[in-house]
């Protein structure tokens, strides 16, 4: 994937989490943020341009691991997300690619598609005529679930530890980003480009909660229509800023080579 997308992974609102060393106060929130294509070394590489908060705060006040690696070569979206969410390799958690060949049917399968769990509500599926992600177009059903994930995730383990008090959510622009991080015990919500709203499948919910309906009713995505993402400074002020627009780059429909 050439575009950088952010998956706000797991928001776990819980009490009584047991760690190796019990903190003075119980941990009530665990937030996992997974950024597509953001290698660990890039955090320091671009650190000179950081402002207050954000990555600067994480570097100054957090623990930064400079030599942490996972043993897989295929760096597609679902592979990395599932590896970070489970702590296991693709050969174990099963998410080996965005699309793989099903040995039983002999057909290509999209990683989180599941005909048994259709999308909740109408008009939220993938529109193949406008979808720019070729892997999404290969799905033979609009249904989605974490069934293909063979191991438990961080959220699953915390749910097992805490029980019904744990509130586990995965939120992402992409279905595969939200589902892998929400796991089997959480609830995944992702953005429907067709419907312009956050959606889920019947694996997770029988009806949308009021707070999701309220957010969708605000029409936040529509407020960004006909607007562009403008740089704060001149292009030459950025590292590699002058090389951003090249003739050999992919020209995404509706986006161009830069946006």
Regions found by a protein language model. Give the residues of each.
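Short, structured active-site-proximal loop/turn typified by the sulfatase FGly-forming signature C/S-X-P-X-R
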Residues: 43-92, 167-169
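His/Asp/Glu-rich, glycine-adjacent segments
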Residues: 88-259
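Extracytoplasmic/secreted cell-surface and envelope-processing proteins
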Residues: 40-43, 77, 178-182
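Beta-strand elements within well-structured catalytic alpha/beta cores of enzymes
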Residues: 27-39, 58, 84, 158
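Boundary at the C-terminal end of the N-terminal hydrophobic targeting segment
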Residues: 18-22
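Bacterial N-terminal signal peptides
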Residues: 7-16
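Positively charged n-region of N-terminal signal peptides that target proteins for export
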Residues: 1-4
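Second-shell loop/turn segments in exported
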Residues: 39-45, 68-71, 139-146
